[in-house]
From Swiss-Prot:
Keywords annotated in UniProt: Cell membrane, Disulfide bond, G-protein coupled receptor, Glycoprotein, Membrane, Phosphoprotein, Receptor, Sensory transduction, Signal, Transducer, Transmembrane, Transmembrane helix
Organism: Rattus norvegicus (Rat)
Main location, first listed in the record: membrane
PANTHER family xrefs: METABOTROPIC GLUTAMATE RECEPTOR (PTHR24060)
Extracellular side: 35-590, 649-654, 724-753, 811-825
Gene3D superfamilies: 3.40.50.2300, GPCR, family 3, nine cysteines domain
TM helices/strands, residue ranges: 591-615, 628-648, 655-675, 703-723, 754-775, 789-810, 826-850
Main function: G-protein coupled receptor activated by glutamate that regulates axon outgrowth through the MAPK-cAMP-PKA signaling pathway during neuronal development. Ligand binding causes a conformation change that triggers signaling via guanine nucleotide-binding proteins (G proteins) and modulates the activity of downstream effectors, such as adenylate cyclase that it inhibits.
Domain of life: Eukaryota
Family to which this protein belongs: Belongs to the G-protein coupled receptor 3 family.
Record gene name: Grm7
Signal sequence segment: 1-34
The name this protein goes by in its record: Metabotropic glutamate receptor 7
């Protein structure tokens, strides 16, 4: 019979003429009759309209034998569900009234080739021709029972079986509705146009499984598939959807071969292969019951309890049988199953079945023996010997365990879908006819298929039963997790559902040993905050983590970006934050010293100025040149004041005052000193040439010259104001160190180092010029005592500013630039002012206060005395002296008496002329 089926399948697919098929019917009839003599192989129920049924009543047989042991749940439960549905429909006056549904139910033995041979029974009536002229080899006409016409088929179960059967049913336009086949390829309406199913395809299931895996944070999984259409196509769909979704990688795809010599060794090898990628703990399984059981057993033998995270397809569902004796290795397994509900009416129906009231089921006696582990004395077919005999009084659910099989609901829905289609077809074609009218009998499968695709009713679970254009049912799944710890009822727990989108109650989930924390199945642990992923070529789920360095932050998982100019990375480098703004604070050590010196200087300056004002008409004050002394003291005071402006918090007003007073104090001081030294120099130079007094040596002239020199500084400042108005800035370059944590923005006036030097440059020029005059007047006699202190002042000041320049510019790249430069500048100005104050005025103040007896006018100087001193000084400069240290020079000066009659003879007296 097997070889006949294969031959007929080939001939049918090759579209041989019907006459050839007619000849083969003789052989088919004889073979069918012979098989009926061997054992009953189908269920026949008479009716006005006959539906075919394909169920895996038996498992695959060993090599050479088509069928094996009976399958109690997947086989008998589902078969009885069809019988139950037929009873309900035939007793329903509102569904197919006056029409009785019959059935021809066959066993597929869980094998696609055997199912194909069995399904030829459904097409016999369609290829039946006039056989009056047909003779068998012995000359006799063929003898066979006229087959009933099957208008539609319920089944099959396995996807590979449905694919094989669908190929032949479509040739004869027989609609087919499956209750369990989920292979995605069956959605191809061009190849399987007469195929429909009340369960969603694996493409929906695969999408749901991808959503589950991603919801749990897993991105590195392995797949395991039973060889065949269901397993391989399911994994193919899962892989394709995961690629489209992104963020999910397949570590390895393992296929379980169908033909195995040693099951134990093969499954142990599979577990070892899965362990080659230890980070891929999640295993997505599309496998049959037996393969699931064997893989769990192999994992237990490998002592991998708790390692693998199983994600099972609907072939696993909520079944208990595959987990028997392997509950510990299966704990935490997540399984998916088309949304279903227990059909209570079926439970009552099935538990009431006995050998007496269920004779229509030709396999029920065999089920009875298997279910109650007994042996029937007459019609039993149980192979193994047993001492216990079946009494026939056993009861299902009472004397044996019973739990409704998961696909019972879908079998019932499939039968009802066919019934509703026939009902609408009957109403349209047989409106005025009771029963099946000729039009309906001749309508054909294509018309029935149209009605099937348009059915819409509430199924046994209360959910709508409908089909899309490809014949697929909507995707509705329940999601379970197998839990044995921390529960009073170990078993499958409903943790979510999927209907186009995932709803998962993660808080209800637990894993091995009752752990609530979701285990990981990732190639590489997520990068820490502030690190970016650098993916490995070919494995986007595997990466190395590279820290964002410098002023970079983690922009996204793959990218580090630089923070804006005025920001730095936050602590974990996940974003940017503003760089702290700093300025020189009053309490800073860098500010305390300059402020202290400035305050001392200001006090001293005020004291000197007050003393000079108090003793304004005394000889020492008058001899110092009162007008320029007050100007010089004002400049010294401003040199001290600039310290406070340099440390004050920058704003527009402070910055404006900085520009004005930065060089003004020094300019006033050195302008006054320059005027003094220039006056001394001109007087003595003029004295060498003539007895006529030089011009512009009066106090008014001296003030005018000093004011002119100062006005140049002020003019430059006003031009600076016009070209570049004062403003405040935040300088981020100054303190932008290699370590962003130490980065600071410096709040300061918009004054560059070059502008500072330019502002001080004019004052430095005055200082240098004054120093030159101090050098030139170094030979002035001691009686003209203003020149020497000025000279010492200028020498010291030059040393101070020569030290200032390298310090100021040498710290341009230092992190402490703000502090060092400000402190250096203010201290330099304080020292310059202090040197001038100390050398020029402190000795005079000391005499005024502590030795007032010396503050008297000794003699009046006339310009004649100055000329005489200048002449003698000139002579001495050209005549070598035998006395060291200028003693001769002093002696000569002392011998000159400007009050002698000779001196007064030719010259006018300059009693009020002060040097």
């Amino acid at each position: 019979m097997v070889q006949l089926g294969k031959l007929l399948r080939v001939l049918t697919l090759m579209k041989f003429p019907c006459c050839v098929l007619e000849v083969l019917l003789c052989v088919l009839a004889a073979a069918a009759r012979g098989q009926e003599m061997y054992a009953p192989h189908s269920i026949r129920i008479e009716g006005d309209v006959t539906l075919g049924g394909l169920f895996p009543v038996h498992a695959k047989g060993p090599s050479g034998v088509p069928c094996g042991d009976i399958k109690r749940e997947n086989g008998i439960h589902r078969l009885e569900a069809m019988l139950y549905a037929l009873d309900q429909i035939n007793s329903d006056p509102n569904l197919l009234p006056n029409v009785t549904l019959g059935a021809r139910i066959l066993d597929t033995c869980s094998r696609d080739t055997y199912a194909l041979e069995q399904s030829l029974t459904f097409v016999q009536a369609l290829i039946q021709k006039d056989t009056s002229d047909v003779r068998c080899t012995n000359g006799e006409p063929p003898v066979f029972v006229k087959p009933e016409k099957v208008v539609g088929v319920i089944g099959a179960s396995g996807s590979s079986v449905s694919i094989m059967v669908a190929n032949i049913l479509r040739l004869f336009q027989i609609p087919q509705i499956s209750y369990a086949s989920t292979a995605p390829e069956l959605s191809d309406d061009r190849r399987y146009d007469f195929f429909s199913r009340v369960v969603p395809p694996d493409s929906f299931q695969a999408q749901a499984m991808v959503d589950i895996v991603k919801a749990l944070g897993w991105n590195y999984v392995s797949t395991l598939a039973s060889e065949g259409s269901y397993g391989e196509k399911g994994v193919e769909s899962f892989t394709q959807i995961s690629k489209e979704a992104g963020g999910l990688c397949i570590a390895q795809s393992v296929r379980i071969p169908q033909e195995r010599k040693d099951r134990t060794i093969d499954f142990d090898r599979i577990i070892k292969q899965l362990l080659d990628t230890p980070n891929s703990r999640a295993v997505v399984i599309f496998a049959n019951d037996e393969d699931i059981k064997q893989i769990l057993a192999a994992a237990k033998r490998a002592d991998q309890v708790g390692h693998f995270l199983w994600v099972g397809s609907d072939s696993w569902g909520s079944k208990i049988n595959p987990l028997h004796q392997h509950e510990d290795i299966a704990e935490g397994a997540i399984t998916i199953q088309p949304k279903r509900a227990t059909v209570e009416g079926f439970d009552a129906y099935f538990t009431s079945r006995t050998l007496e009231n269920n004779r229509r089921n030709v396999w029920f006696a065999e089920y009875w023996e298997e279910n109650f582990n007994c042996k029937l004395t007459i019609s039993g077919s149980k192979k193994e010997d047993t001492d216990r005999k079946c009494t026939g009084q056993e009861r299902i659910g009472k004397d044996s365990n019973y739990e409704q099989e998961g696909k019972v609901q879908f079998v019932i829905d499939a039968v009802y879908a066919m019934a509703h289609a026939l009902h609408h077809m009957n109403k349209d074609l047989c409106a005025d006819y009771r029963g099946v009218c000729p039009e309906m009998e001749q309508a054909g499968g294509k018309k029935l298929l149209k009605y099937i695709r348009h059915v819409n009713f509430n199924g046994s679970a209360g959910t709508p039963v409908m089909f899309n254009k490809n014949g697929d049912a909507p995707g509705r799944y329940d999601i379970f997790q197998y839990q044995t710890t921390n529960t009073t009822n170990p078993g499958y727990r409903l943790i979510g559902q999927w209907t186009d989108e995932l709803q998962l109650n993660i808080e209800d989930m637990q894993w091995g040993k009752g752990v609530r924390e979701i285990p990981s199945s990732v190639c590489t642990l997520p990068c820490k905050p502030g690190q970016r992923k650098k993916t490995q070529k070919g494995t986007p789920c595997c990466w190395t983590c590279e820290p964002c360095d410098g002023y970079q932050y983690q922009f996204d998982e793959m990218t580090c970006q630089h923070c804006p100019y005025d920001q730095r990375p936050n602590e974990n480098r996940t974003g940017c934050q503003n760089i702290p703004i700093i300025k020189l604070e009053w309490h800073s050590p860098w500010a305390v010293i300059p402020v202290f010196l400035a305050m001392l200087g200001i006090i001293a300056t005020i004291f000197v100025m007050a003393t000079f004002i108090r003793y304004n008409d005394t000889p020492i004050v008058r001899a110092s040149g009162r007008e320029l002394s007050y100007v010089l003291l004002t400049g010294i005071f401003l040199c001290y004041i600039i310290t406070f402006l340099m440390i004050a918090k920058p704003d527009v007003a402070v910055c404006s005052f900085r520009r004005v007073f930065l060089g003004l104090g020094m300019c006033i001081s050195y302008a006054a000193l320059l005027t003094k030294t220039n006056r001394i120099y001109r007087i003595f130079e003029q004295g060498k040439k003539s007895v006529t007094a030089p011009r512009l040596i009066s106090p008014t002239s001296q003030l005018a010259i000093t004011s002119s020199l100062i006005s140049v500084q002020l003019l430059g400042v006003f031009i600076w104001f016009g070209v570049d108005p004062p403003n405040i800035i935040i300088d981020y370059d100054e303190h932008k160190t290699m370590n962003p944590e130490q980065a600071r923005g410096v709040l300061k006036c918009d004054i560059t180092d070059l502008q500072i030097i330019c502002s001080l440059g004019y004052s430095i020029l005055l200082m240098v010029t004054c120093t030159v005059y101090a050098i030139k007047t170094r030979g002035v006699p001691e009686n003209f005592n203003e020149a020497k202190p000025i000279g010492f002042t200028m020498y010291t000041t030059c040393i101070v500013w020569l030290a200032f320049i390298p310090i100021f510019f040498g710290t341009a790249q230092s992190a402490e630039k703000l502090y060092i430069q400000t402190t250096t500048l203010t201290i330099s100005m304080n020292l310059s002012a202090s040197v001038a104050l100390g050398m020029l005025y402190m000795p005079k103040v000391y005499i005024i206060i502590f030795h007032p007896e010396l503050n008297v006018q000794k003699r009046k100087r006339s310009f004649k005395a100055v000329v005489t001193a200048a002449t003698m000084s000139s002579r001495l400069s050209h005549k070598p002296s035998d006395r060291p240290n200028g003693e001769a020079k002093t002696e000569l000066c002392e011998n000159v008496d400007p009050n002698s009659p000779a001196a007064k003879k030719k010259y006018v007296s300059y009693n009020n002329l002060v040097i």
